[in-house]
Amino acid sequence: MAQKKAVTVKGKKATNGEEKPLAKRVTKSTKVQEEETVVPQSPSKKSRKQPVKEVPQFSEEDESDVEEQNDEQPGDDSDFETEEAAGLIDDEAEEDEEYNSDDEEDDDDDELEPGEVSKSEGADEVDESDDDEEAPVEKPVSKKSEKANSEKSEENRGIPKVKVGKIPLGTPKNQIVFVTNLPNEYLHKDLVALFAKFGRLSALQRFTNLNGNKSVLIAFDTSTGAEAVLQAKPKALTLGDNVLSVSQPRNKEENNERTVVVGLIGPNITKDDLKTFFEKVAPVEAVTISSNRLMPRAFVRLASVDDIPKALKLHSTELFSRFITVRRISQESISRTSELTLVVENVGKHESYSSDALEKIFKKFGDVEEIDVVCSKAVLAFVTFKQSDAATKALAQLDGKTVNKFEWKLHRFERSTSGRAILVTNLTSDATEADLRKVFNDSGEIESIIMLGQKAVVKFKDDEGFCKSFLANESIVNNAPIFIEPNSLLKHRLLKKRLAIGQTRAPRKFQKDTKPNFGKKPFNKRPAQENGGKSFVKRARF
């Protein structure tokens, strides 16, 4: 028993600190346990939970129990055995020191410095990140989106985007087509889709005239597309309920050489009437009518330049009981001067008059260079002679006389200047030129008076008479006051233009563009309250 106690005492001393290897072995096991438990506590970025390794813990009591079990084995009670046991303990302690020193070096290498991540943890993170990257979660979604985008792009390829604006300069004319007879309302994409099947479009230019008719210039990338459109059947050029009219644009100068201007046609004539009338002498390519409904003019384009002389023979012929005028559009206007040109006043208010009849009368006095029949409210025609003596004779013999039941009033042509002319308004129907001369003779010398129904234009020879004439404003002529204002030719021109445009549109009260709240109940806006004023009180309606 004494020997067993001695062995146990030596074992306890070794564990308590006298024998350092045993104590160091215990501390090493606890240190490894701390490191192995601390490292898993720093979770990775991918997975925050990791299994904690369980390491068996050895205490001093367990080691003592193990040694006691070893001591209980049979042996001799001699001193040799005790020395041998002590030697064995020393050898084991030395081996433990070597083993622990190696472990300490390995542990020193495995110890983490501040801010350092363990290699095993980084490897786990890399493996986890690789697993996450290889996970087929987003790849099918990206493939579907790319497939959907490709399908959308294929659908959009059916109706290409076309630049809307002026056709670029330098575009060959064999790549451009002119489209007319468009419906009043249509979609841009429908028009593009209709012509895109013939070829790739490069530009599209829209036009709208004063009558509201729409037309389009379409430019193709190649001439084959334009040729395909020109050769297409009407069924392939149908937009809505309209069959589009397609032609190739021509040179403006070339068109003018094949075009004649027709005047005095009247406001009720149509394009078909003119086309039928001129096709009696030559093929007609196109007919257009000006928007001025008071004094409209027509432009007839023939198929060939050689047919122009045939069309000019229709000048001064009768169309629907009206004598029309026909001349070249490129005809240079003859310069009118006061020495050679006489103005024939439209006393009879004729809407048309035969130029041949006028020529028969005026050629008695000399060679006539031009007779321009106008048939406006004030002027019937301008007669230009080749010599000034012929104009003087005609003015002296015809002015104020009646020939062939026609009252002639002539005066020399003067450039229209409103510098010394006044406009007299509010005249009665029985007012005459003599009545106005009685009023304005006191102002100054009168050059001319032109009666225009309830209006009159009085022109003075000097500025003094023009200035004094305004003193006669509100004078009484035939029991009615007259009103005087400067005669502005620009004003008359603008008023006529507005009147012509207004007649082609609906009455103002039916125009939606002039009334933004058309058809809506009016909104009575509450007046703003002033600072310090009384609050608004809405009154009851009775």
Swiss-Prot record:
GO terms for cellular component: cytoplasm; nuclear speck; nucleolus; nucleus; protein-containing complex. Residues 136-158 have a biased composition (Basic and acidic residues). Disulfide bonds: none annotated. The modification Phosphoserine is found at residues 42, 44, 120, 129, 142, 304, 330, 443. The N-terminus is blocked. SUPFAM superfamilies: RNA-binding domain, RBD (SSF54928). Pfam families: RRM_1. One of its GO terms (molecular function) is sequence-specific DNA binding. Residues 1-166, 505-542 are annotated as: Disordered. CDD domains: RRM_SF. Keywords: DNA-binding, Nucleus, Phosphoprotein, Repeat, RNA-binding. One of its GO terms (biological process) is regulation of alternative mRNA splicing, via spliceosome. Residues 59-114, 123-135 have a biased composition (Acidic residues). Residues 175-251, 258-331, 340-429, 420-489 form the RRM domain. The keyword Phosphoprotein applies. It is found in: Nucleus. Its capacity to bind DNA and protein(s), and its differential expression during development suggest a role in the regulation of gene expression during Drosophila development. It could, in interaction with other factors, be required for the translation of instructions provided by pattern forming genes and controls, via chromatin changes, the activity of genes critical for the process of morphogenesis of several embryonic territories. This is DNA-binding protein modulo. It comes from Drosophila melanogaster (Fruit fly).
